[in-house]
Amino acid sequence: MNLENLMPPLMFLALVVFLLSGYPVAFSLGAVGIVFGFLGIALDIFPAPLLKAMPDRIFGIMSNQLLLAIPFFTFMGIILEKSGLAEDLLDTMGKLFGPLRGGLALSVVFVGAILAATTGVVAASVMAMGLISLPIMLKYGYNPRFASGVILGSATLAQIIPPSVVLIVLSDQLGVSVGDMYKAALIPSALTVGFYFLYVIYVALFRPKWAPALPPEARPDAGKEAQAAFALLSYLLVGVGAYAVGRFLPAWAEWLEVLLALGIWSLVLLPWIRKNPLLRRALLSMVPPLVLIFLVLGTVLIGLATPTEAGAMGVVGALILAALNRRLSFKVLYGAMEGTAKLTAFVIFILIGSTLFSLVFRGVNGDLWVEGFLTGLPGGEVGFILFVMVLVFLLGCFIDFFEIAFIALPLLAIGAEALNIDKLWFGLLVGVNLQTSFLTPPFGFSLFYLRNVAPKEVKTADIYLGGIPFIGLQLLVLVFVYFLREPILRFVSGMGFGG
């Protein structure tokens, strides 16, 4: 084997050594790229003019309109965390589901899905629900392990439910439409939420001491929950029915018909709304997030806005909501801007480092080496997918999803392209798998977020063990996505709005 063939594996090995040594990822990528670039030039196996393309690549990163969505969604998530949205939803839904065993856990899953569809940021969801719900669940006798697991699992829904930042990054790296990725993610999102609900119901039925119902004294609106729940369910059915009928109308008429149907149904339910304070609070707490979901997600799905434009509208909506709740202050704005700037700088530096590494790696024919290795795996497409899923799962135990997306995904995509695997479906598999990276010990970020806000009586072991069933459920969804490839792709291609 000559030196030219050794360069790609040596580059990869050097990167692994740097990362395991604890050096920052961005600088590790850049250092390996620079060192091996000059080494390749000295050995006459790397064309020096390629390095001249680096400034253009960096300019391309800085001018990428799609990546602007990341700071927008991050800023929106931090503002919403301070706006009182989570508190209102958790309080109202907790009272609504309170009479049921496992009702508080069901409300946490429901609110987790709503927060995921509005913010797309995991940290905000974990900390909000950990601060608000966990003490209440423990107060009324919930098992600490089960309560911690429900909060962890529900918070990670922000990884797969649009407008997830993960899906934006995956779309950018794979070169697929964000709108299509969002549409494809609706199926695993629904499956994940459904499995969470089923798991909570299972625990409530077979381990009732782990998830008791709220006592009557903890429910000021006792006796009104069933009516409020029925009314909210009827809204859902009316909305879905109107949407199904509206599929035969133009896009603008379709959404107008849905809004009109919900408005008429509100008039029908007006006597209930007047007499039932719990129903009023539930509707008032649901309207702001639903408006935000339409601004952020609905406009992307129906093609009215790009993810960047939707993120900008979401920021405006979050600021208005925080102002209406009297939670907007200079301190809140400063904290949101600081957090957004830090994450954006982190992402940009990793992108610059990974671009330099990729430029040199491909310049020494590393892409051919990766393609040969991945396509040579036993089992063909099945063997490749299995290898990638195991690799992503293991990487998720140790490094952040940004690092996986910017370092590993471009290399793995080479094999997917060589095997003619649909990039959208492949990206969706990786996205579902990346959910687990927030829950897997020892470095799952959600575990640390919850540990920081959990009461002292909750042991670290309870937090770690509580997340394991939800890792299993997420992997089960991954299996479903694998076997539902054709239905998912047909759903995306056939998901028109307005016929």
Task: Please give the residue ranges for each predicted region.
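Alpha-helical transmembrane segments of multi-pass membrane transport proteins
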Residues: 1-499
